[in-house]
Amino acid sequence: MQSDIEICRNTPLSSIDVIAEKAGLLPEEFDTHGKYKAKVHPKCLARLNDNQNGKLVLVTAITPTPLGEGKTVTTIGLAQGLAKLKQSVMACIRQPSMGPVFGIKGGAAGGGYSQVAPMEELNLHLTGDIHAVTAAHNLASAALDARLFHEQREGYDAFEARTGLKALKIDVESITWKRVMDHNDRALRMVKIGLNEHGKTINGFERNEGFDISAASELMAIIALAKNLKDLRQRIGKIVVAYDLDGQPITTEDLQVAGAMAVTLKEAIAPTLMQTLEGVPTLIHAGPFANIAHGNSSIIADEIALKLSRYTVTEAGFGSDMGFEKACNIKAAAANKAPDCVVIVATLRGLKANSGHYDLRPGMAIPDSIFSPDQAALVAGFENLKWHIKNVHKYGIPAVVAINQFPQDCEQELTALQDLIHAFDPNVKVAISTAFAQGGEGTRDLAQYVVDACEKTTNFRPLYQKHQSLQEKLMSVCEAGYGATNVEMSELATKQLAHFEKLGFNELAVCIAKTPLSVTTDSSVKGAPVGFTVPIRELRLCAGAGFVYALSGSVMTMPGLPDKPAFMNLDLDEDGNIIGLS
């Protein structure tokens, strides 16, 4: 079989003008970026306001292996399958970060015959939104350090007298705003800045600093959750970057940098329109990771797609304990729209990996032995799929299971898995998906089951309500969302929680950063564990995004590269074509 990039290059594509017209957009509602990309103006929603909303289909998964189980392939394949059924459909996915593209997972355009194209344009830079996020974020960092420098160098009274500005009196030890970059670089997790020659302060004042990956920036979450430019601007102004000497928050508005940050992000609030290999219009917008952020594409992209099509197919990062939980408890609340149907992607290899019979860790190749028939491992790993089915039903949303088939899969085991699902819950429809090998043709059954599920009545139930305390919200996600029996707050996290509640941030949502490789915070614990504790080591306030960010276990907000990163496979041929991207 051809590689993903070869399939993409050998498939004729329509110009983006044709795709935009197919989606129902007017020429003045988008700006082309080359032949196959366009920025869609959010203002088109004013014209579409009276259109009835379509159905929102959210794709999630079992607890994945480090290489993923094919959510994006299934998302794109399902959208193409719905088109095969003559349904009006659009897909919405996140913009890939170059961190994973050059790191372990590679690209995020789908694969095989279920891709967004051109895949190299999607995976590398796209229309520059992540670079804009990085620039706007680091502008706030520069503004903060500049203000700190001038106030401390001159003294507060002299600074106020000279500038006419009120001294912010920044507590250096309280600075929470790290810098960001769109690469995996563990060496930047902890750094010192403001270093000078002896006796000089020309470079600023020395302090500890660190970098997060751009996908973890609060600005990325804000772009994904903002409804329009006005909302974007207001949210940016609420970002807390530090505290003053009295413990009061200092915001980007206080630094008078929020307006410039919004200017930097003016174009980034517009989703990018592309197409699948079968010509399904696809909106790509925002790229928050689900393990260290809220893991869903933007509300604006969803709203445009829901107004233009009968079905909008989107995905949430990692398993249903990760991006799906945050879609239900953060995104749905901000958008006032919950999914009408959820597709849970499962694979034979993923379930066997959850059996505890295999040791799969990031950077390791998937062993061929995992594809050999192993009924005991399949049955043991099935507990994980049961967990995710029950988890989706907990929110009152109909679920459909898609078994993403690999070429090496054993037919007997595929049948056995379907039997296990039917025996567990006869009301849950299950379809074999061959989206990778066959595109939309390989998801016809899945697409029909999704159409049927979308006609069912939903009884959406988030895990917590806005009025509950932050402590109650954290407990709800850990206990009801993960199945933990206890939440263990560090001394630091306990102090931070009390501080946030004292400052009046009690009504914010909670976003827990944890490993995606287990329902627990320990990546080595597989299956459907019970009776575990969730350790919360630190809280971060994301007042602009609208949530408190809890770091659990040993999760890092700046990933590192493996010993054999994906960038080793990338190069250019003599004609300038990219090779080795997958």
From Swiss-Prot:
Q: Tell me which InterPro entries the record gives.
A: Formate_THF_ligase, Formate_THF_ligase_CS, P-loop_NTPase
Specify which residues bind ATP according to the UniProt entry for this protein: 65-72
Pathway where this protein functions: One-carbon metabolism; tetrahydrofolate interconversion
Give GO MF terms, alphabetically: ATP binding; formate-tetrahydrofolate ligase activity
Kindly state which reaction or reactions the protein catalyses: (6S)-5,6,7,8-tetrahydrofolate + formate + ATP = (6R)-10-formyltetrahydrofolate + ADP + phosphate
Keywords carried by this UniProt record: ATP-binding, Ligase, Nucleotide-binding, One-carbon metabolism
Pfam families the record matches: FTHFS
Q: Which CDD domains match?
A: FTHFS
This protein's record includes keyword Ligase: yes
User: What superkingdom does the record give?
Assistant: Bacteria
Example GO biological process? tetrahydrofolate interconversion
Per the UniProt entry, the Enzyme Commission number(s) are 6.3.4.3
* Family statement drawn from the similarity comment of this UniProt entry: Belongs to the formate--tetrahydrofolate ligase family.
* Name by which UniProt lists this protein: Formate--tetrahydrofolate ligase
Species in which this protein is naturally found: Vibrio parahaemolyticus serotype O3:K6 (strain RIMD 2210633)
Task: Kindly list the organism's lineage.
Answer: Bacteria, Pseudomonadati, Pseudomonadota, Gammaproteobacteria, Vibrionales
Q: Per UniProt, what is the name of the gene that codes for the protein in this document?
A: fhs
